[in-house]
Amino acid sequence: MEAEESESFSYPMLLPSDGLYPEDDDDADMDQDKNPEENVMNEKEDEDVDAVDEKSGEEDVEMDTMEDENENDEDTEQTSEKKETEETPKENPLEKLKQKASTASFYDVVPTLAIPMATSINAFAFTSDLKWLFTGGEDGYIRKYDFFPSINGDLSLTVAQRHPFVDTVTKAGILLNYWENAYDGNKPSSVYSLAAHSRGLWVLSGVNNGDIILYSTRHQEGYPVTSLKKHTAPVSCLALHGSEKKVLSGSWDKMVYYWDLNTGDAISTYNCESGQISNIVYRPSGAVNPWGSESDDMRSLFGTPASSSSYDALFDEEVEKAIEEETKSVQANEENETEKPSQTESTTNNDNIKAPSESSSEESNIFLTTSIDGVMNVWDHRMVDSVLKYPVPKGVPPWAMSACWSPDGNNIYIGRRNGIVEEYNIHSGKEPVRSLKMPLDSGPVSNVYSMPNGRHLVISSFDNIRLYDLQSKAGIGFLIIPGHHGGLVSSLYVDTSCQFMFSASGNRGWQGTTTEVFLGYQIMTS
């Protein structure tokens, strides 16, 4: 037993980490032989992976930088757009329409609205935005209509009302209110003339006893606020100054008064001495530079001092010197007023800056008047007597109800009883430049209106309203505008955007038949 125990030998336990079996040595040697190649391959793969990671990282950085640049570009574009919108003001759509109308080669005028009235419509007036329409007639009532729903067709004419008109006339007027043309409890008087505030705050009305009544139309509608008393006969025409603080009135007493609406006093008096006043029209403000001075207005109308030897002056030398001295004194007064110190700088800046409309309205000093006997006068607020006087030409009957200026303010068109429209140029003497003849059976010309392009003239005769082309040289030079037929036209009006035209039929207290209808037309330019 001892021998067996002595002979027995025990091997120590070996862990795999401590040693390998002999047969594993060869495998280990083989593995060692293979490992260098695998290590090289692994190193290459690791290098490739690192390179790919570096490339992807670079691409990510590039993408981030590109995104940042795009964001910066967008921000700069937005800021530049904001600056452009802030620097460049938005275009006024009304100015676009005016520009389009002034350059139009043709106007297509189609009647769409009719307001029948059982009285002679002597006058009508609009607010500046065409929101409200005021009409006055022989029955002694002033009516107020809502224009936009009317022209949009919210109320249609009945079958009986549509019968006298063409097929395009389907819309009727929407009446808002009406009131009597009277003051201090007097009997209602026929409305001979109307003038409305641009925003509809008040309306002026001419009465048969010579008064001019001012009605409130926005607050206490139809309330007679005051009455201007100076005329002794019916006030046949009213013309608001551009500032809407003054008004010209003409009457059957052959007098024209210039009123201050703030005080109710007559500033100036103009005696026509020839006949009942039938029309008063201010010279267009576009005829002069709207940013110029009063002397520019005079020079554009009557020539320049530098060319006094070459042009036909309408004033003599003494009058020209007086006007120059007056304009110099006015300019000196303006300079003294601007030199006066003020309380704050902001108020001085606001006082000195004027809008184009305000500055141009302050310069509308020249106007024309026509008398029922056919005589026409051109006046200036800075002079007592008329600047120009156009007598009735030989062979022409003594009758004139309307006259108008051309858009540039250099020509005057006046309608005659014998169906002729005479054209005068204020720089070329007192004889008509040419005569536009209507058909023999057309009747007297009761109203004329010049279109914004200066090429077309709207002429209303007893039979029809015509659109006359002043540049036509052969053939018939006019087109008949459908709608009106068989009556005198008391008033014609084209809105500032040249999208609508309006006509009213009335005799204004003189002899003549009427259709007793107010018509509205839509104008399409081309």
Swiss-Prot record:
One of its GO terms (cellular component) is chromatin. InterPro entries: WD40/YVTN_repeat-like_dom_sf, WD40_repeat_dom_sf, WD40_rpt. WD repeats lie at residues 116-155, 186-225, 230-271, 348-389, 395-434, 440-478. It comes from the Eukaryota. Residues 21-30, 44-78 have a biased composition (Acidic residues). Residues 31-43, 79-98 have a biased composition (Basic and acidic residues). Keywords: Cytoplasm, Nucleus, Phosphoprotein, Repeat, Transcription, Transcription regulation, WD repeat. It is found in: Cytoplasm; Nucleus. Residues 341-364 have a biased composition (Polar residues). GO terms for molecular function: transcription coactivator activity. Residues 1-98, 327-364 are annotated as: Disordered. GO terms for biological process: positive regulation of induction of conjugation with cellular fusion; regulation of transcription by RNA polymerase II; transcription initiation-coupled chromatin remodeling. It holds the Pfam family Beta-prop_SPT8. Component of the transcription coactivator SAGA complex. SAGA acts as a general cofactor required for essentially all RNA polymerase II transcription. At the promoters, SAGA is required for transcription pre-initiation complex (PIC) recruitment. It influences RNA polymerase II transcriptional activity through different activities such as TBP interaction (via core/TAF module) and promoter selectivity, interaction with transcription activators (via Tra1/SPT module), and chromatin modification through histone acetylation (via HAT module) and deubiquitination (via DUB module). Component of the 1.8 MDa SAGA (Spt-Ada-Gcn5 acetyltransferase) complex, which is composed of 19 subunits tra1, spt7, taf5, ngg1/ada3, sgf73, spt20, spt8, taf12, taf6, hfi1/ada1, ubp8, gcn5, ada2, spt3, sgf29, taf10, taf9, sgf11 and sus1. Belongs to the WD repeat SPT8 family. This is SAGA complex subunit Spt8. It comes from Schizosaccharomyces pombe (strain 972 / ATCC 24843) (Fission yeast). The gene is spt8.
